Amino acid sequence: MPSNDVRILLQAAVPAAAVGAVAAVVSAVVAGGKGAVGAVVATVLAMLFMGIGLYVLQRTAKSLPHLFQAMGLMLYAAQILLLFVFLAAFKNTTLFNPRSFAVSLLVVTLAWIAAQTRAHMKAKVLYVEPEPTGEKPEKTGHSS
């Protein structure tokens, strides 16, 4: 990943992880150990989905810019589908508190989106690629 992409990833992941830690503490106080486990699972899941999504979108923007918007929509649909699969797999689980899981997932996702939006607004992204500084020598010979 180029350094700008890593910078945006870190500026989104660190606040989301901090919000996830706070959610885990609050869930532990409110719902006990299972609440804390639910908040940690939700934090890891949200950060994993959002991080992979950011990585895929950054690669798409560089290699296939004409597919960027379609890839964003497809990625959003895939994230929602994967979340539904996860929820269906752990529908009747007793491993964690589902309410603290749901609230933590929502809060961490919103924190990631807000932090990523802020990071993109502060980033100096070039909209037009600059011309290379070195002049290419002209071909003077016969081309065959």
Swiss-Prot record:
Keywords: Cell membrane, CF(0), Hydrogen ion transport, Ion transport, Membrane, Transmembrane, Transmembrane helix, Transport. The chain crosses the membrane at residues 12-32, 37-57, 70-90, 95-115. GO terms for biological process: proton transmembrane transport. Its main location: membrane. One of its GO terms (cellular component) is plasma membrane. It comes from the Bacteria. It is found in: Cell membrane. It is a multi-pass membrane protein. A possible function for this protein is to guide the assembly of the membrane sector of the ATPase enzyme complex. Belongs to the bacterial AtpI family. This is ATP synthase protein I. It comes from Streptomyces coelicolor (strain ATCC BAA-471 / A3(2) / M145).
